[in-house]
Amino acid sequence: MKKILSFLLATVILLPCFSGCAESLLPKEVPEDFSFALTWGVYGISSYDSRTGKLVKTKDATNPADYVTYVKLSDEVMELIYKKLRALNVESYPDEYDPDPMMGSDPSADLILTIRNGDRVKTVTAKDVSLSYDALFPKGKRFIDTCLDISDILTDTEEWKALPDYEFYYD
């Protein structure tokens, strides 16, 4: 009986730790092998991958290669983005996410956020997001705002500004 009680007590004490003490994808300090990728915009025409530095302004162009550049973000910018992603708690989002299932628009935006830490990867895909970037709940608004904050950082780089203007605009 003592063994059973000891086992139950140990289970009650340790079970929460096993379910909640797993190492976070984004620990407090920026991991050496942290990287992220973001796809954003109308139909997901723009993208950036910090692993390769590839920054794409648009894939909808006569010559898409003209709209591609490479940018290595500074350690300070990477740390700023890391803090935004950590505050988002990306692990709490499902792989397929709709920030506002009650809202839609045509055209619509895609937001695809991938975070890598070594061999651990988490991707959250939000397709057909209303271009008003509204969300039904605060969690959805946090996801949208984080993605837009990161895209603002990327579109503020000199490399982005040096790319040609869009050929096509969506009505």
Question: Language-model segments: what does each one mean?
Answer:
Residues 1-4:
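Positively charged n-region of N-terminal signal peptides that target proteins for export
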Residues 9, 13-16:
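Hydrophobic core
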Residues 19:
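Polyanion-binding surfaces on beta-sheet-dominated domains and ring/shell assemblies
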Residues 23, 74-102:
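Charged, amphipathic alpha-helical segments
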Residues 23-37, 98-171:
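Short, well-ordered, aromatic-rich surface patches in folded extracellular/luminal domains
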Residues 23-72:
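N-terminal export/targeting and maturation segments
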Residues 69-72, 80, 122-126:
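Generic detection of short hydrophobic beta-strand segments and adjacent strand-loop junctions
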Residues 70, 74, 78, 140-143:
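Short, charged, low-complexity patches
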